[in-house]
């Protein structure tokens, strides 16, 4: 456990060499999401593998109030410092963790040597129109959570929803550093499998992100849902291995 700003964070390390590979799961998910992939990545790359639970998830302490990406970035920075990881980090970020990756990479360009963004939440998606659509679509689920805040899952959902619109308006303006290569894996079905319009916007955002800078590659996980690491671990492993070889 690593302490930061009054709360404890659970980090898990598989020893190895650089580049260090940091796996970050999506919203509401903890480090166990990667349990089947970790030994495969370690065997394929020989790299140090780091997984962790963001605040309020898994074994990490909850933090009261709205979820703030800046706080999540600070937690990851503190964790890596405590683990003495000071260079050559590859981020593997799924879904909401893409937001953490974008801000973290902007603030730590000398630390991050590459990223594999797995159906990640990317800035290009969040126009004012799409933010309004997503807030409206999520309202019934958020209202249900507010009616029963006794579970950790519901409290995390409420925390994420509280600051959603202004946070994503700011995120829409964030750009990925040109100096950091990124592989973008987008699912065919996306998180919005029941909404063709939102699903297309998600895929379009991934394509726009990939075109917006050098050393970016777009790959579609054909037939996959949002859970690419679960349904297509072979693809995720292959792209991590390629990035690790290139940055090793």
Where are each of the predicted segments found?
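Conserved catalytic-core motifs of eukaryotic protein kinase domains, centered on the activation segment
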Residues: 34-35, 60-66, 127-128
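Conserved hydrolase catalytic core segment
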Residues: 87-124
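Flexible "cap/lid" loop of the alpha/beta hydrolase fold
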Residues: 115-150, 157, 204
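Conserved serine/cysteine hydrolase catalytic core
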Residues: 144-224
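Catalytic active-site module of serine/aspartate enzymes centered on a nucleophile-bearing elbow/loop
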Residues: 214-248
């Amino acid at each position: 456990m690593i302490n930061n700003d009054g709360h404890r964070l659970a980090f898990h390390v598989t020893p190895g060499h650089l580049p260090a590979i940091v796996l970050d799961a999506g919203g509401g998910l903890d480090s166990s999401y990667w349990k089947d992939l970790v030994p495969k990545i370690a065997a394929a790359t020989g790299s140090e593998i780091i997984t962790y639970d963001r605040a309020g998830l898994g074994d990490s302490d909850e933090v009261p109030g709205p979820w703030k990406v800046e706080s999540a970035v600070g937690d990851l920075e503190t964790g890596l410092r405590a683990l003495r990881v000071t260079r050559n980090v590859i981020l593997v970020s799924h879904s909401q963790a893409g937001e953490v990756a974008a801000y973290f990479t902007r603030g730590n360009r000398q630390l991050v040597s590459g990223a594999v963004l797995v159906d990640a939440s990317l800035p290009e998606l969040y126009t004012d129109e799409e933010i309004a659509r997503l807030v409206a679509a999520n309202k019934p689920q958020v209202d249900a959570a507010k009616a029963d805040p006794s579970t950790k899952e519901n409290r995390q959902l409420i925390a994420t929803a509280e600051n959603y619109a202004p946070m994503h308006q700011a995120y829409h303006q964030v750009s990925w550093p040109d100096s950091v290569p990124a592989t973008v894996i987008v699912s065919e079905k996306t998180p919005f499998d029941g909404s063709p319009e939102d699903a297309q916007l998600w895929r379009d955002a991934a394509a726009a992100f990939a075109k917006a800078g050098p050393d970016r590659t777009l790959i579609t996980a054909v037939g996959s849902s949002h859970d690419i690491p679960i349904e297509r671990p072979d693809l995720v492993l292959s792209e991590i291995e390629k990035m690790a070889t290139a940055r090793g």
